[in-house]
Amino acid sequence: MDTIEDIVLDHDGRGISALRPHVATDFCTQAADLIIDSPGTALIVTGFYILDAGASETDGPPGAVVIGEGLAALGYEVVYVSDRYTVPSINHTIGDAAPVIDFPITSDGQSEEFAVDLLSRYSPSVVIAIERCGMTAQGTFHNMHGKDISAYNARTDFLFTSHNRTIGVGDGGNEIGMGNHADVVAATESLVGMPCVTKTSELVIGSTSNWGGYGLVAALSERSGKNVLASVEHEREILDSFVEAGLVDGMTQDNVPMVDGFSHDENSAIVQRLQDYLRAKGVSA
């Protein structure tokens, strides 16, 4: 039987599997264990701006909501964090289910102050990033093509440098958490040349970050004995809602229900395989 990690790394077109020898074999389970050992409040950070489209992408926010709903079902308080380019779409999708914090796009000093205040206000037990562009060694933020998007990306890294229980989910090397293996990212031709240097306690990789997030929730389900992973139908509804709110496919830059070039059906197939895995393990709702 394929493992959760096998499933979320299937169809790896970007080469993120180059990191697999460097992360835990069961990296989704390791991240799930950190969460289970940290009951309380989870901050979930997401949102990645697509420069040429002038909008945020569909990879990240759907995974954030699937993680958030799963954690809520396990008794966690959930708080979402993004910046002005993604916050409206999260509000559109979740309604009043959880607070959504608009992290300002501002200087390092003001960003760090905002992060410290936010951590003080909510006292999160764990902080999770999924497909969140992270800071390079130069203190800038770059997309997969190497273009500087610093003006469109809040410096949410300070939430992670100021907390000791953190998880990063990424697929390309420029996301928060990739600092754990920045040297491997930089040496892998298919990944970004200017990797994120922000580290996290645990790193989850996937062919898309959403898939990595779904794998994390599958692992949480297995560890808790309760299936809290979104159904195929609900995952499609979440993605459709974000598209309705204006998010774009990061590959085509079109406002369509695709994620990194993967269609609805391709995304659904990954969710179904994870659900089949949980069923085979005897995990039910």
Regions found by a protein language model. Give the residues of each.
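Positively charged, low-complexity intrinsically disordered leader regions
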Residues: M1-T41
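A glycine-rich helix N-cap at a beta->alpha junction
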Residues: I94-L118
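C-terminal functional extensions of proteins
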Residues: I176-A285
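Conserved mixed alpha/beta catalytic, RNA-binding, or beta-rich assembly cores of soluble enzyme
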Residues: S56-P61, V126-V127, R132-K226
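Short, glycine-rich nucleotide/cofactor-binding loops
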Residues: L19-V23, T46-P62
